[in-house]
Every structure is written in structure tokens, then in C-alpha cells.
Amino acid sequence: MSDISVEKLTELEAAAELERLARAIAHHDELYHAKDRPEISDAAYDALKRRNEAIEAHFPALVRDDSPSRRVGAAPALATFAPVVHARPMLSLDNAFSDEDVRDFVGSVYRFLGQLPDDSIAFTAEPKIDGLSMSIRYENGILVSGATRGDGTTGENVTANIRTIAEIPNRLPAGAPAVVEVRGEVYMAKSDFLTLNAQMAAEGKQTYVNPRNTAAGSLRQLDAKVTASRKLRFFAYAWGEMSDMPADTQLGMVEVFRQWGFPVNPLMKRFNSVDGLLAHYRAIGMERPTLDYDIDGVVYKVDRLDLQTRLGFRSRSPRWAIAHKFPAEQALTILRGIDIQVGRTGALTPVARLEPITVGGVVVTNATLHNEDYIKGIGQKGEPIREGRDIRIGDSVIVQRAGDVIPQIVDVVLEEGKKRGEPYQFPHVCPACGSHAVREEGEAVRRCTGGLICPAQAVERIRHFVSRNAFDIEGLGEKQVEFFFNAEDPALCIRSPADIFTLKKRQENSLTKLQNIEGFGATSVKKLYDAIDARREIALHRFLFGLGIRHVGEVNAKRLARAYLSYAAFEKAALEAVPPKEGDRTDKGSEAWQDMLAVEGIGSIVAEAVVDFYGEPHNREVLAALLAEVTPLDEEARVATGSPVEGKTVVFTGSLERMSRDEAKAMAERHGAKTAGSVSKKTDLVVAGPGAGSKLAKATELGIEVINEDDWFKLVGED
């Protein structure tokens, strides 16, 4: 779904994508901030956050309580250092990736303050140090604590380790405010990093990946002596709680820090124009290779503190500052091969195998190739990229590394007189299971259709199968599914949906008893078996949703169930629409295909996904095994209800006090109405409870009838 443009997402798809992004970004935040071992590049991480923000902007009603746009970093690692609550939150900065982004930032500052862009507002520009953010607190001039940023609100108490850094003073000069929090970046110099790695190699120990991770890991040592041996350094550039402000500008505050004995960056300067900021950005970029510390951009800040106060903050970042990121580092190497990886959603992703090359101090052997169009030299909108040059095995390629882990191939260097290899043929068969891999119109990604049988997708498919709106099997959460899937004992393993329903029988004939395994017990095992048995008969729409057919979400599953009424009829139609000729997507001339297209709300994309699924023999085998254990119940035929809301589209918003949101949907459908998650011109009625916000405002704007919850009950005759 991540390859679908935001504008094409349905509300259900957008909600699912926001949930996926929230989990993914939280996972990578924890790896980066709490465990110091990132899995993806900075650019890939930024792309996740930008997509999250774009979806939230397009679907503001779907913004989650746990949205990444509402938090910073990750909570500190547990059972290591005591937590410290920051007196003032340590927020992250928004990013700029182009000159235009910087001009937009400066323009937004002028617009917010209601001033014309006449260069009257000064900005500072300083290198963005690639280290670990730190807050150091002094009371009455004495260092009392040092804390990491953590999640921005709570960090880790690393005071003992901070005291070992020679560049951080233990006392402030006389005259300093009673309470001072100096903030900055702990880092390891490149020269010290190389010396440390040489020492580790000489001792036969594993060397470190880069200075940033090494500095973070060194600062989190439980033994302060280890930290002291690592020669960590510090740059001061910001502050937290201050009982008195010794200066009224950003530049003035940093100068005060210098006078107090803190190292400050000598490349920090003040400018009154965007052109000045951008010129300094390029100058720092030119000087970057000669610096003895890693930087990944330049930070711009409004210089006057009174203007910073007026500008204030967004939920997780200040309006008065932005980080202008540098482009990724690049190197030239040879493409030795292309492997295909299958993701948990069935997406086939090409991975380049490279002649080893050092990029930014790290040896790179693999790189992402994104998708088959990217290999062909075609961009996301069909435009030529790399001047239309395709990528072939044996080519000289430019590798770009935009962070700590995942590099990418950005260009091909054609050598005159050198014969190239054959154009790469992207596989149309899944390498993990042998099922067909199809690419839907308008999408960049080719996906495996083996759904229920593909080992690369199995865990995710089973999690979906047992989820709340599918089979809803209590006791089979994410951890339990992972446990059963990875179990090697045949009496315990669950690799397909049918395995869930044979678990009890397999256990009866096994010496390995589930109740004897840690995390389970006799009571919980009985409850699990009871929950499984309770789903041996299941509503047709839940059964269809549980199969995990692409594009058949909860709404479309209900549409199909209502149209076909029985599983036998649905399966017959799907199989009759399967093309007799291999390679065709669907038998578009068949009556079954035309009937499926005629189902209200089901278009060709959904119908083709259904036919692709049933066209795979592997899927049919798994379904046969499942149907031997489970009976999908026939859907009751819809009859005219005579209800005043029959055929209408209803939106529920705000807090409902007499029913849950699911009960409200069920009641509306029982009376022949359709429910929607957003208000549009097609909405007939809005039921608004306390706290109704944007949906209520939109309904009022469009002149749509709005009633409260009590009036709803009266309207449908269930008061």
C-alpha cells in the first residue's frame, strides 16, 4: 500500500497505512534513539515520516493518538539508567531537503509574524552534528545531572558518564543563573573513532560501524570508566530550563556558553537573507570532508529570542528552526547481481549485489533498486530517470548512502566501447513460493498472489486472519502467532489458517503439551481452544475478509457477501472468472466477471485481485484445507426495511454515549443504511456526539442534516 499515492487511498486504506506507519516509525525510533542500531537510512526514515504527514494532511480526521507527528524519538531503554523528565521538552526539528524548502521556511516565519520579507529578521546557521543529544543541568553553578533526549519528554540519567567528558565543565563561573540547562551534542571525533577501531582490531575484537553509534553506545555504558576511555566530545548550542536569560539572541546565548567553558561550533554565523543562509550551507558542505566530526546538514534558527517565543512550537518541533539536510554520499562500483526479496505484504523488491565499496566510512555490498520500473529507468509518474538509462548486471553504478544502513543505486556510468549485459528481466513468479507475481495498473510494485501459501507473507497473513474484524480469535495475538509460526514441533506449528483449527487434535496425540510451555497454562490453553472452536462457523463477510485478498477490506468483504449470499456462490463466480489461458489476468468475457463488476462498490481492481487469488492453485489448496475445518455461514438476503434511513449514507462523529462505534455501524446497516468515515456531498445524515469537530463543521458547511444520538435512536425506531 505504501506505493499507492496519497490521493488514491480510500479512507480505510489510509487508516491502515497510518497504523502501519505509526508502528514502523516507533520501531525505528526505538532502534535509533534507545538501542543505537538503526536498520534503515535517514532518507528512508524521513520518507516514512513524510508519507505519514501527507496522509494526515489529506485525512485529518484519521490522525491517531500515537501518531509519529505527535512525538519525538523513542522512550529510553528500560532497566539501564534511571529516567529523567525534562523540565522543557527536547523537541526535534523539521527537515528541509532543498533550497525551495528553506525559502518556504523563511517565508513562513515572516508570514506568521506578519512582517514583509525585507530581510529584517536575522537567522543563525550552524552545522548539524551527527551525535547524541544531551541536556546538562547546573544548579547554583554545579553540574547535577546529564540526560539523553529519549522520547523528548523523558530521557536517561547518564550523569556519571557525562562527568567523564573533559569538554563539559563541572562548574560554571560565578554570576551564572541559579538554574541552567545547557543542551548540545555528544559526539566522537573521526580521528578518535579510527584510533579506537584500530585498537579493537588489534585486540581481535569486533570493530564499530560509525562514530555516531559508537558515541551513543559509549555514553550508555553502565561502567563510567569505559565511557571515560572513549574520548567523547561535546558541542553546546541550545538550552532548556533557565532561571534567568543571560542574552536575548541565539548567537548571544551560544557566546555565553563559550564564556562558561563549553565548546561551541566555530562555523556558526548570522545572516539576514535566505541567500546568505544557502551560501553558508554550501560552504559548510564543501568543508565537510575536512572536518573531524560528522555532520548531516545545517540548522537555521531565528536569532532573536523574543521572536522565537512569538513563533512558538508545533506538536513536536519549533516554528523558528529547521534542519537543512545534506545530500547522501556517493561512490562508484560494479553491479554483480540482482536478488529479489519478498516482503510480508507480498511485494517483490529488487536488491543489488555490489562489488564491495566504502561509502561514508562504511563498506557497502548491497543496495536497494526499489522496483522494476526503477531498473528500467522509469520514474514514479512514468517519466525517464537517469536520462532513460536502465540498470544491468555488470554495469558501473553510482551508489548513494543516505544514512547508516540502506544505500541505493542512483545512476549508471556507461563506458564507451564496453559491451553491456542483457536487460534485466523482472520475475513474474514469486521466488519464495512459485506463485504468479502481478502488477496492478498504476502501481510500481509487483506482488506475489500466493497469499495463504507464501512463506514470506505467512506470519502477516495469519495475524490478519485472526484479527478482530476477521476471525477474531482471542488468545492469538501477535506474539502468540509468532510463537506458533516459528515452532518446529509439528504438534505446535501454525503455518496456515487450517493449522489453527487442527491444533487441539495435534496436541492430543503429542508428548509436547502446550500448557507446559512458558507463557501458557491449562486455563489459557482451554480458553484458546474454546475461542478457536467458537469460530468453526463464521459470518461470510468475516471469512472473506480473513482471507487477506488484496483490496478486499472489511467494506468490500461485506459488499461481496451481500451480493453472493453464500461462499459456494462466491467461489463459483471467482473460479469461473479465472482465465483459461495462463498469463491473462481475468476472463473478461465471462458472465461471472461481468457479474462481479456489477456488484455495487466493486470495480475492476478489486475484482482482478479476487480472480488472481483464486487463480493460484496453492491458494485453492489452502482454502480446501480450511473449509474442511470451518463453515462460512450464508448471508441473509437484504430485504426492504422500510426504515427512514434505508439507502442513505450516514456518518457518526464525536463521542457516542449509548453505543459503541461498531454497534452504531451495525445498527445503521441493519436499517439498510451505509456508513462512511468522512463527510462528503454524498453524505445524507451526520449523527454527532459530544466533541464532534471537523466532520460536524464540514456537514454544516455542506448543508447536511445533523442529529444527535438520541434523535438517531428515535429516527430508526429503537428508542
Curated annotation (Swiss-Prot):
Class of enzymatic activity (EC top level): ligase
Xref: PROSITE patterns: BRCT, DNA_LIGASE_N1, DNA_LIGASE_N2
Cofactor: Mg(2+); Mn(2+)
BRCT domain residues: 640-719
Residues annotated as catalytic: 128
GO biological process: DNA repair; DNA replication
Key words of the record: DNA damage, DNA repair, DNA replication, Ligase, Magnesium, Manganese, Metal-binding, NAD, Zinc
InterPro entries the UniProt entry points to: BRCT_dom, BRCT_dom_sf, DisA/LigA_HHH, DNA_ligase, DNA_ligase_AS, DNA_ligase_CS, DNAligase_adenylation, DNAligase_N
Pfam families named among the record's database cross-references: BRCT, DNA_ligase_aden, DNA_ligase_OB, DNA_ligase_ZBD, HHH_2
EC number: 6.5.1.2
GO cellular component: cytosol
Binding site for NAD(+): 42-46, 92-93, 126, 149, 185, 301, 325
Annotated catalysed reactions: NAD(+) + (deoxyribonucleotide)n-3'-hydroxyl + 5'-phospho-(deoxyribonucleotide)m = (deoxyribonucleotide)n+m + AMP + beta-nicotinamide D-nucleotide
Residues annotated to bind Zn(2+): 430, 433, 448, 454
A molecular-function term among this protein's GO annotations: DNA ligase (NAD+) activity
Record-stated family: Belongs to the NAD-dependent DNA ligase family. LigA subfamily.
Its job: DNA ligase that catalyzes the formation of phosphodiester linkages between 5'-phosphoryl and 3'-hydroxyl groups in double-stranded DNA using NAD as a coenzyme and as the energy source for the reaction. It is essential for DNA replication and repair of damaged DNA.
NCBIfam families documented for this protein: dnlj, PRK07956.1
Protein name: DNA ligase
Organism: Brucella melitensis biotype 2 (strain ATCC 23457)
